[in-house]
Swiss-Prot record:
<keyword id="KW-0067">ATP-binding</keyword>
<dbReference type="InterPro" id="IPR020556">
    <property type="entry name" value="Amidase_CS"/>
</dbReference>
<keyword id="KW-0648">Protein biosynthesis</keyword>
<protein>
    <recommendedName>
        <fullName>Glutamyl-tRNA(Gln) amidotransferase subunit A</fullName>
        <ecNumber>6.3.5.7</ecNumber>
    </recommendedName>
</protein>
<feature type="active site" description="Acyl-ester intermediate">
    <location>
        <position position="180"/>
    </location>
</feature>
<dbReference type="GO" id="GO:0005524">
    <property type="term" value="F:ATP binding"/>
</dbReference>
<dbReference type="InterPro" id="IPR004412">
    <property type="entry name" value="GatA"/>
</dbReference>
<dbReference type="GO" id="GO:0050567">
    <property type="term" value="F:glutaminyl-tRNA synthase (glutamine-hydrolyzing) activity"/>
</dbReference>
<feature type="active site" description="Charge relay system">
    <location>
        <position position="81"/>
    </location>
</feature>
<dbReference type="InterPro" id="IPR036928">
    <property type="entry name" value="AS_sf"/>
</dbReference>
<dbReference type="Pfam" id="PF01425">
    <property type="entry name" value="Amidase"/>
</dbReference>
<comment type="function">
    <text>Allows the formation of correctly charged Gln-tRNA(Gln) through the transamidation of misacylated Glu-tRNA(Gln) in organisms which lack glutaminyl-tRNA synthetase. The reaction takes place in the presence of glutamine and ATP through an activated gamma-phospho-Glu-tRNA(Gln).</text>
</comment>
<keyword id="KW-0547">Nucleotide-binding</keyword>
<dbReference type="GO" id="GO:0030956">
    <property type="term" value="C:glutamyl-tRNA(Gln) amidotransferase complex"/>
</dbReference>
<dbReference type="InterPro" id="IPR000120">
    <property type="entry name" value="Amidase"/>
</dbReference>
<dbReference type="InterPro" id="IPR023631">
    <property type="entry name" value="Amidase_dom"/>
</dbReference>
<comment type="subunit">
    <text>Heterotrimer of A, B and C subunits.</text>
</comment>
Length: 493
């Protein structure tokens, strides 16, 4: 393995700017690693070697000419979740219904990455339309966890997390609807952040559940994640839900956190996310992390979020309802797959045949649940009640933040489970999102940072850090301080 690919993104960027390395060298090293390992891990759905090397060459030309580089990450390659549109690569969302489809426009996140001089290596595997917790729902086959190829890497963004853990890329982009960035990060010993809702544009992010979806950064260190966060965040007039507010100084917070001083920082432990139902090794790792935060000077106390116990039920009414609405656009008429278009079927039959063939079982399940919840006789009983619970969950967190600065919990109830273990048990799969989805309902920000390996099975465990809306910098200060105190972990490969 080329040692270049083991470097963190900040180091690579500094070496590229100093002419110690070229962006083409770094990008080629990543492409070589993908070629050597992706048959084993299946992290990528599409590799854009020529496009990535072309973007890298542009950065190298700027360095050679002594020009100012467009960002602190210029020249460092990245893996992009296949839910963000790209004009020069297919965007499939892990679904047969979009197989081979190319968007006529770039997502805002894609545009920002290109403008920052970040070569895009390709598009990563994911659960179909971001619905799942294991990346087993991809129409193109599952991604395998580099820590143990018989285990899942989490989902829906398991491809991005696996690419980081396998040293195929130093940076990645994911999307988080109920934990799809944080949960895979926890299972692969990487760092993943769900920014405050509305602070990273959703323009060009193919919608799963519009009020929950949020793009975010992933990397192997907290500082690298902060540097990428700074690139992709910001107001966008093309996204009606975009927040017109200054981006918090996440990079400054991450750098400050490495000093390891959390004196005066108030940390809350969620009572409802600590106790029964967790793997013993996960709980042991979490308690050790809380002790470490205390040793760094943080003031730790327990906080009560009584409505968290209803979060799972509310989420799995709100999300399918939005899915039912959003996925109605895949009607076989405008783009994507079309079945039965031979003149012998009506338009309605073509639509039915196409959706039956193009959508996988989990997507169909959620469409049916959502359509039922939105039906005239059940709208008030289900969807409206779920929205009321959502408000109560947000109020629980608001009340907690009156007495603490951040809230912590395990990122997942167990370590990575086996491939095929939960695929036929939707409820068990849904329960795996227990720790992460309340944050999406509230619209706040959260991070998963590696907290070691479980003594149960020697697999990664994640510490989840949560903060109020527009206080993303708090995540980075606490996360970086904890990361520095925890010390280095061994890698997956």
């Amino acid at each position: 393995m080329n040692e270049i690919i083991r470097s963190d993104a900040a180091t690579l960027a500094a070496r590229i700017a100093a002419k110690e390395l070229s962006s083409v060298e770094v990008t080629q090293a990543c492409l070589d690693q993908i070629a050597a390992t992706d048959e084993r891990y299946h992290a990528f759905l599409h590799v854009a070697a020529d496009e990535a090397l072309g973007a890298a060459a542009v950065v190298d030309e700027a360095v050679a000419a002594g020009e100012r580089l467009p960002s602190p990450l210029a020249g460092v390659p990245l893996a992009l979740k296949d839910v963000f549109t790209t004009v020069d690569m297919p965007t499939t969302c892990g679904s047969k219904i979009l197989q081979g489809w190319r968007s006529p426009y770039d997502a805002t996140v894609t545009t920002k990455l290109r403008a920052a001089g970040i070569p895009i290596l390709g598009k990563t595997n994911m659960d179909e339309f971001a619905m799942g917790s294991s990346t087993e729902n991809s129409a193109y086959g599952p991604t395998r966890n580099p820590w143990n190829v018989e285990r899942v890497p989490g989902g829906s963004g398991g491809g991005s997390a696996a690419a980081l853990a396998a040293f195929q890329a130093p940076l990645a982009i994911g999307s988080d609807t109920g934990g799809s960035i944080r949960q895979p990060a926890a299972l692969t010993a990487t760092v993943g952040v769900k920014p405050t809702y509305g602070t990273v544009s959703r323009y060009g992010l193919v919608a799963c559940a519009s009020s929950l979806d949020q793009g975010g950064p992933c990397a192997r260190t907290v500082l690298d994640t902060a540097l990428l966060h700074q690139v992709i965040a910001g107001h966008d007039i093309r996204d009606s839900t975009s927040v017109d507010a200054p981006v918090p100084d996440v990079v400054g917070a991450a750098r400050a956190g490495t000093a390891g001083d959390l004196k005066g920082v108030r940390v809350g432990v969620v009572k409802q996310l600590r106790g029964e139902g967790y793997q013993p090794g996960v709980l042991a790792s979490f308690e050790a992390a809380v002790e470490q935060l205390t040793a760094l000077g943080a003031e730790v106390s327990e906080v009560d979020c009584p409505h968290f116990e209803y979060a799972l039920a509310a989420y799995y009414l709100i999300l399918p309802s939005e899915v039912s609405s959003n996925l109605a656009r895949f009607d076989a008429m405008r783009y994507g797959l079309r079945i039965g278009d031979d003149g012998s079927h009506s338009a309605e039959e073509v639509m039915a045949l196409t959706r039956a063939a193009g959508f996988g079982p989990e997507v169909k399940r959620r469409i049916m649940i959502g359509t039922y919840a939105l039906s005239a006789g059940y709208y008030d009983a289900y969807y409206n009640q779920a929205q009321k619970v959502r408000t109560l969950i947000a109020r629980d967190l608001d009340a907690a933040y009156e007495s603490v600065d951040v809230v912590v919990s395990p990122a997942t109830p167990t370590t990575a489970f086996g491939l095929g273990e939960k695929v036929d048990d939707p409820l068990a799969m849904y329960l795996f999102d227990l720790c992460t989805l309340p944050l999406n309902l509230a619209g706040n920000c959260g991070m998963s940072v590696p907290s070691g390996l479980s003594p149960d099975d020697d697999l990664p465990v994640g510490l989840q850090i949560m903060a109020p809306a527009l206080a993303d910098d708090r995540l980075y200060r606490v996360g970086a301080a904890y990361e520095a105190a925890r010390g280095p972990l061994r890698s997956a490969i």
